[in-house]
Structures are given as C-alpha cells and as structure tokens.
Amino acid sequence: MQTKVVKIDPFQIDENEMKEAAELIRKGELVAFPTETVYGLGADALHPEASKKIYAAKGRPSDNPLIVHICKFEELVSIAKEVPTQAEKLADAFWPGPLTMIVWKNEKVPYETTGGMETVAIRMPKHPVALKLIEESGCLIAAPSANTSGKPSPTEASHVKLDLDGKIPMILDGGPVGIGIESTIIDLTEDTPMILRPGYITKEMLEEVLGEEVKIDPGIIASDSLTKPKAPGMKYKHYAPKADLVLVDGEAENVVKKINELVAEKQKNGLKVGVIATDETKDQYQADIVVSIGARADEDAIAQHLYKILREFDDWNVDAIYSESFATPRIGQAIMNRLLKAAGHQVLQV
C-alpha cells in the first residue's frame, strides 16, 4: 500500500483534499490526521472492521479501547446509553478541547471500538482539520495516536509516516500539534468522577466546573498491568523510545551529579548516552547528547517537546537515556505520567 501524505492548511482547508480523506473514512479505511493534542489514526467508529484495521496497523492490543471523536454534543447523546449531567457541564466548559469523557455505551458502538468494554470514551477535538474530517465524512471517528503501539506519540506528520508508511492510505499533514500530550480522560460511570489519564485539563479545573470531588485513579502512577484497561494508555507500556530510559528525581544539584555518574559509567562500557535536561541544567551534563526540553517553569513547552525529543533519541541511536523529573504544579502530573510509562517506571530517587 502506498501512503499518500497531503499537506493541509488548518486555517484554509482545501475542500477537495478533505473530501478524499472523508471518502476513505466512509469506506472503512484509515486516515491519520492532526488534533490539538497528538496526531490520531482515524476510522469509522461504528464500523467493527474499520476499528480492527486500527489495531492491526498499530500493532495495538485489542483490549485497549479507542477514543471516539465527534464534532457536536448530539453525537455523544446518540451513542451513550445515558448522558450524565456532568457530561453536559464538562462539554460546555472544555469542548471542543483536550478532554475525553467515559460514559456507558449503547448498542450502536461495537465492542471492537471499546476494547470489549460496556463503556465508550468520547472527545470533541479542537483542531479544525479533525473537526472538518468528522463533519465531512459524516462518521464518528475512532482514533488512538497514529503511531506504532508502545512508541512515543506523533506530534508531527513525519512521525506518523515513519511508523505507518505503507500501512495506511493517507496522512493529513496539518503541521506540528499545539499541546503535545494526549487528552485528559475522566470516567463518568462511577458515583465519583475519576481521572483515568491526566492531561492538559487538570483535576482542579474539572472540580471547579463540576462543583464536586474528582478522584485520580491510582493506576496513573502504578506499574500494575494485570487489570483490564478502561481507558487508553492504562495497561501497556507506552511512549517508549528504543533505548532504555531512566528518570532521576530529587534536588536539582543531586540529580545532575547522579546523572553524570551514571553517564560516565555507561560511557566506560562504550555506550552512547543521552540526557533530557532543562534550559537551566543542560550545560552541566557530560553525556554524548544533551537535549533541553525547555525552561523548567514552562510546562506547555515541556509537554509540547516531550514526544519529539524521545523520537529524536531513536534517530541518534543512543544506548541509554537519563531524564530529569518534571513534577511541575499544573500539568506536571500528565508529563510525569507519560515519562513514567516511557521509562517502564524506572525511577532513581537521589
């Protein structure tokens, strides 16, 4: 299969190119497209065979649910068994945007899309290309990240092509994404709403809108993979570069000292070592490759650069990677959640 890459201006969308992509979706084929979070790999969410193609192209376990992308709230109503009042409040506040809600599904949604679950994850993306594709196709679009399962999520079309070239018919190239990490996922099927995946929309933001407590699933920081995942990203190793990644957490001075010791040890054995640092510390490391993820206080930049940097280390063929910890106040939990999964929960406290 030849993969067609179509450059598309998000602010001046070519109708003919979008019609071609929409027709592929209607035929049960796959199209990769930009969202404000990461690039998604889309197919008709209500077409069981189309959803199966997503799992096959990504090498994704079939019990890992897909997020259904919509362009209007009525589409949530059309596939939900019931619509919690919380869903309406959250949609008013955060949609379109990087928030996914889990509700009970009705019979329209195939189990191939929900990973065998009785619940369905739903989001209205903010990116104009994503919204136009949903509208033009007339389909609800199931879309996980457009990458090989387990690898860092794609924040540019080139990342999608690297992973899925020859496996899907089309990639819509809308340029680099804005946020860089996946949406927050909130489960609305329990008595108390619960965050199953942290993201740009924080617990505090959700609680302010809902006027009630929002819990955080312990699995966000745990490494247990025995339970059935209710949301994408909960069970399997994700976001991982080829090289072994270890996080080093502690006071900045101690972290720099420890990482340099670890780097020296690896280099003695002839290994090529990379370090993920910040603007404040990048000049203090003696690794083969040192990359700054941004200023420590700039959470948005850290989130936006994370996956791109992990992929760049693959290009540089490093043997080991050490990273500072980025437990910042606002979206730091989301950033650390992704890093912990990428590192297979390998953390050194110093």
Predicted regions located by residue number:
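Active-site-adjacent structural elements in enzyme catalytic cores
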Residues: 1-350
